[in-house]
Design a protein with these regions (language model features):
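Helical element adjacent to the flavin cofactor pocket in flavoenzyme catalytic cores
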Residues: 139-198
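C-terminal catalytic lobe of FAD-dependent flavoproteins
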Residues: 252, 275-279, 287-424
């Protein structure tokens, strides 16, 4: 065994092999892959996975990863045998609700470049004559199919690049990982130690056990899953090819099927979650079949077999041969766990990755390791998304189990998890409960979505043109309409406590921050700037505001959900041995947004301060007193109205709320929830990171070029932006209004021009002040001119839309600045 390596990869399943393969293709050498079992039938989930590959996913990144996986597997073979069979897939509908859901999923697939179509019951039977005639239809995706993951892993290991760069050590168990000063130093096995700066854990169901070696609680959980194969089926007796039938999903009954020569494989999620602890997994030496396979539990498969017989009549009462409970991983949010952990430099994970995405994950992990950038937007799966409460054992148990049980459910994009809840409460929470707030959870915070106490305003405003009736009416209330309109007419109180607040101070803080941001920070004390933080390629990594509190002291404000992601990025750029202090002070500060035309009247009354533009200009800050509470006020608004963000110590939060709320009614200012917050920001054209803003687009494409100052000293991404400007824009973020009054879509729908998908919806809502349905999406510049006509495909129907000049509301920003 080598005693030193550039990188040690733990686990020789499909993810580990794919990453090693792609690193070798990028020119890396001195790569070690350690596997506790044999090569390549390792005994992990790769070894028993049925191999079904469905590329449709609500997440663009997950869909792209599966598409990359299909490309990879399709170009691999082992001893003349393919590693992928592109037989297509059918997602079957047996209920009207599922049929409608499939229309939506077809749209999502088209958005992300898939060949997705709805086929009739007759066409379903042409693809698979074994199916029942009672089905209502199916979504057919041409390039889905069956992957042979073990075959693919071995094929990659046989490549010249891998043979020259990678050493595999089978039957070798990792016993410990050593760190020095928070950095990876070496890895210890039962056959010796290897010194290395980088450890990548691709250990799958053993991932949490590896994480414990560096004191990280990986938020994933393993579950047993029932899978069986039938005896030979008479109707398939002449099928000698490995697979010819499209793979099947019967999501109404939480089942899937695959043909394998003359038999059928059947998998069922239609049973209670059966969790398995990583520390309880058997060793290879004592496992009956494999460490990732447990004894079949027929009681959990009874309903599945009844449902299988109803869908495929020839399966009724058929005998089963191969029967297992295979073990594989689920996470708390359904996404894999990728990236370098902030807690330990050099410790990386690529865990909870299914066969469907493994090839693509290996590719982006290699790029991430080699270049510091995965090449696509990975924020949904980045390890930096996890908050401390996400790492709690009880939280992991509940959320991962829920994701197992709901894996094939119809999930509305606004649907909330029922548990665990009430993890983080703002100091205003009890007051919000008294106002009958409808709460949603975001990053652990309970946030008002709307307030039932505002229902009385439905009599004030005519909302008949705005009422929703379909899918878009779920998880929504017309109260959001009046909260929007009342904010525009008078004002609203917004709970901003979940915002992430980061304090940066110390010698060199200005120079440091100015280097990692695109805007110019060297402004007078008290100024507030909006800026992006960029990757070296010019993509938008973060967007946030920075307030200069003193010469070398700054307050960075970021969103709540991605705040730790932004904090990690900022900290990762800090020079070694720097005197700069970066502290997350989020829990110590509460915040209220007081926004709307009468916000100045309210705040001047309760503070006694002159808040006029001459005394308190837009994008500036001051300390003010509200009922003897010292507050930091920032004149900035995320809804496009005159207003201030008011920050005060959390301990004074309830007093702050009472002081503001008790006087607000006199001015017609009401508490407002997130639903109206969203429609207000979209109407104003404000971007949301993760929707409009991501590492895949630069600030000019995103429409935030005003936050870039190319004439300042060097900053991260500057050279890339100069090059982007030289080449010119190919795609831009466009504002599109729907021609039909009252029309609303929900997001991720394809944008169609002359029957061709040219983009997809990043955000959508109704603009109640401009009386238009609004969507945003990236489209090629040749279609992005004002007046350009497009269609939005929503549940199989085409909604006509027009590219419009933005912002739609208050284009001259007069309401913000006066």
């Amino acid at each position: 065994m080598k005693d030193k390596a550039r990188i040690v990869i733990i686990g020789a399943g499909i993810v580990g092999c794919s990453t090693a393969y792609h690193l070798a293709l990028l020119g890396w050498s001195d790569i070690v892959v350690i596997e506790q079992g044999p090569i390549f039938e390792t005994g992990g989930s790769t070894s028993h996975a049925p191999g079904l590959v469905f590329q449709t996913n609500p997440s663009k990144t997950m869909s792209l990863l599966s598409q990359e996986t299909v490309k990879l597997y399709s170009n691999l073979e082992l001893n003349g045998n393919p590693c992928f069979y592109p037989v297509g897939s059918m997602e079957i509908a047996t209920t009207p609700e599922r049929l409608e859901e499939l229309k939506r999923r077809i749209g999502v697939g088209i958005s992300y470049g898939l060949d997705s179509t709805m086929i009739s019951p007759k066409e379903c039977l042409e693809y698979n004559p074994l199916l029942s005639e009672k089905i209502l239809g199916a979504m057919f995706v041409k390039n889905d199919g069956i992957a042979k993951a073990v075959r693919a892993a071995e094929s990659m290991s046989n490549s010249k690049a891998v043979k020259n760069s990678v050493e595999f050590y089978p039957h070798t168990k990792v016993t410990n990982i050593h760190t020095v000063n928070g950095k990876i130093n070496s890895i210890e096995t039962d056959k010796g130690s290897i010194k290395t700066d980088i450890v990548l854990s691709t250990a799958g169901i053993w991932g949490p056990k590896i994480g414990q070696m560096v004191n990280i609680n990986i938020p994933q959980k393993a579950f047993e899953h029932c899978y069986a194969k039938t005896i030979p089926i008479k109707e398939l007796e002449n099928h000698t090819k490995e697979v010819t039938h499209p793979v099947l999903r019967h999501q109404d009954k939480a089942m899937y099927f695959r043909q394998e020569k003359d038999v059928y494989g059947i998998g069922s999620y239609n049973h209670a979650a059966l969790p398995v602890l990583a520390n309880d997994l058997l060793d290879h030496k004592v496992a009956d079949i494999s460490p990732s396979i447990k004894s079949f539990t027929p009681e959990h498969f009874e309903l599945g077999m009844i449902d299988a017989g109803n869908l495929i009549p020839t399966l009724k009462n058929i005998d089963l041969t191969y029967k297992i409970n295979g073990i594989f991983s689920f996470t708390i949010d359904g996404f894999p766990i990728l990236g370098e952990w902030p807690q330990v430099k050099g410790f990386w994970s690529a865990e909870a990755v299914w066969i469907t995405h493994a090839g693509g994950v290996g590719k982006i992990m290699a790029q991430w390791l080699a270049y510091g950038d995965p090449g696509i937007d990975t924020h949904e799966m980045d390890v930096s998304r996890f908050h401390p409460h996400n790492m709690d054992k009880n939280y992991i148990d509940i959320r991962a189990s829920q994701n197992y049980v709901e894996v094939y459910d119809i999930i509305h994009p606004l649907q909330q998890s029922e548990a665990p809840r009430n993890l983080k409460l703002s100091p205003f929470h009890k007051s919000q409960q008294k106002l009958k707030a409808n709460f949603v959870e975001s990053a652990g915070w309970e946030r008002p979505n709307w307030f039932e106490s505002n229902k009385k305003l439905l009599k004030k405003f005519n909302t008949s043109n705005f009422l929703r009736r379909g899918w878009e009416n779920k998880e929504w209330s017309p109260v959001a309409i009046v909260e929007h309109l009342q904010t525009r007419s008078n004002g609203g109180l917004f709970d901003l406590t979940p915002f992430t607040k980061i304090e940066v101070q110390g010698k060199g803080s200005l120079e440091f921050l100015n280097y990692i941001i695109s805007n110019e920070l060297d402004k007078p004390v008290g100024k507030v700037i909006y800026t992006s933080l960029l990757t070296q390629n010019g993509g938008v990594k973060c967007d946030l505001t920075i307030t200069r509190l003193a010469e070398e002291k700054f307050l960075v404000i970021s969103g709540g959900a991605m705040g730790l992601h932004d904090l990690h990025w900022i900290k990762s750029k800090l020079p070694t041995n720097s005197d700069i202090e970066i502290n997350n002070i989020s829990n110590s500060m509460s915040a209220i947004g007081v926004w709307g035309p009468k916000s100045i009247n309210l705040l001047q009354k309760i503070s006694g301060f002159d808040l006029s533009s001459s005394s308190f200009p837009y994008m500036s800050s001051k300390k003010i007193l509200i009922n003897k509470i010292e507050c930091l006020a920032l004149r900035i608004s995320y809804v496009g109205e005159l207003g201030w963000e008011i920050y005060a110590p959390t301990a004074k939060g309830q007093d702050l709320w009472d002081s503001i709320y008790n006087q607000s009614e006199k001015f017609g200012i009401i508490p407002v929830g997130l639903a109206a917050f969203e429609s207000l920001r979209i109407e104003k054209g404000y971007r949301l990171w993760g929707n409009e803003l991501s590492t895949e687009y630069n600030p000019y494409e995103s429409g935030i070029g005003f936050a870039v100052k190319l004439d300042k000293k060097d900053f991260i991404g500057k050279q890339a932006l100069i090059e982007h400007n030289r080449i010119g824009l190919k795609k831009v973020l466009a504002c599109i209004t729907l021609d039909k009054q009252g029309a609303v879509v929900m997001g991720k729908e394809p944008i169609i021009f002359e029957n061709k998908c040219i983009g997809f919806v990043t955000s959508s809502s109704y603009g109640y002040s401009v009386d238009k349905g609004i969507v945003y999406g990236y489209i090629p510049v040749e279609y992005a001119y004002e007046g350009s006509k497009v269609n939005i495909l929503y549940f199989g129907k085409h909604y006509k839309g027009t590219v419009s000049k933005e912002p739609l509301f208050d284009p001259k920003n007069l309401r913000l600045k006066t």
